[in-house]
């Protein structure tokens, strides 16, 4: 029913990072596949204008679907390259007072749609399939991985698989989880790399280097996003300049300066990593201590 009213969606985003701890993990995977998000699944964008018109006729949220239909009609008009067709569609929109939201009416939408429909439908039929993706947005727990779970993840259109790597204490477990998934054919990974928490600055360097080296060793892609820790509660919850016990303001500023250059992301490529963070741990600290302005 949701698909009928709102149209099919390309991607599936799951916000619960405890899925692996669930006793019904296998059932969750089966539900994802049954919903059309199995490995290799594709998606063709539905005719959202047709859906908007149907919902208007059912009087389902008139205000919202009047706005939606008008936006789709205007977007279609702006995409037209043929001058004759462009003028025809513009005339239909103008005559029905759809060029301004203040003058747009339900009947005006209906009238313009009758003119636009055959051309719009033709464009929809030309749409090509796109790959679907499943994203466990909060990341899954490397400590819970088993070969069976890796095999199950490989059955769905997961892209990328986010595996948390919050500290060096889970290094071996994390590397094992990545290798299990790679053996099942998964090649796209991502994670947030927490820093400025209870970690030491060198831990950030080591975790990033591990990811880059895994990319080279296993021929996979891991995109790392260093994420500065900030307390949500207690006396530091409103302190935007919070500094962890093992960190200092200079170190934090230096890391942020490097991330500004890398656009916040570190992917595969040892040479790029070495230029950004140093070839050795000593070079990393040299970068952290480098003057802000050269």
Name each model-derived stretch.
Residues 44, 49-88, 117-118, 122, ...:
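Auxiliary Fe-S-binding modules of radical SAM enzymes
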Residues 2-190, 195:
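Conserved SAM/AdoMet-binding glycine-rich loop
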């Amino acid at each position: 029913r949701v698909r009928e009213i709102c149209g099919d969606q390309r991607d599936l985003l799951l916000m619960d990072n405890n899925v692996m701890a669930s006793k019904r993990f296998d059932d969750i995977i089966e539900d994802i596949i049954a919903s059309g998000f199995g490995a290799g699944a594709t998606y063709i964008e539905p005719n959202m204008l047709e859906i908007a018109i149907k919902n208007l006729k059912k009087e389902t949220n008139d205000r919202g679907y009047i706005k939606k239909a008008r936006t789709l009609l205007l977007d279609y008009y702006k995409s037209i390259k043929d001058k004759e067709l462009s003028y025809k569609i513009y005339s239909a929109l103008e005559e029905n007072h759809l060029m301004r939201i203040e003058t747009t009416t339900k009947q005006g939408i209906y009238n313009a749609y009758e003119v636009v429909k055959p051309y719009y439908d033709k464009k929809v039929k030309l749409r090509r399939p796109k790959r679907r993706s499943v994203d466990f947005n909060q990341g899954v727990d490397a400590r819970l991985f088993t070969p069976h779970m890796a095999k199950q993840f490989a059955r769905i259109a997961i892209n990328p698989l986010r595996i948390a790597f919050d500290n060096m204490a889970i290094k071996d477990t994390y590397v094992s989880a990545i290798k299990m998934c790679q053996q099942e054919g998964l090649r796209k990974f991502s994670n947030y790399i927490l820093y400025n928490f209870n970690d030491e600055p060198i831990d950030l360097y080591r975790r990033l280097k591990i990811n880059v080296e895994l990319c080279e060793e296993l021929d996979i892609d891991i995109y790392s996003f260093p994420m500065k820790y900030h307390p949500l509660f207690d006396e530091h919850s409103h302190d935007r300049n919070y500094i962890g016990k093992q960190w200092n303001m200079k170190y934090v500023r230096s890391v942020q300066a490097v991330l500004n250059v890398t656009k916040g992301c570190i992917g595969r490529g040892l040479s790029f990593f070495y230029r950004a963070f140093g070839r050795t741990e000593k070079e990393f600290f040299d970068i952290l201590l480098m003057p802000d302005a050269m």
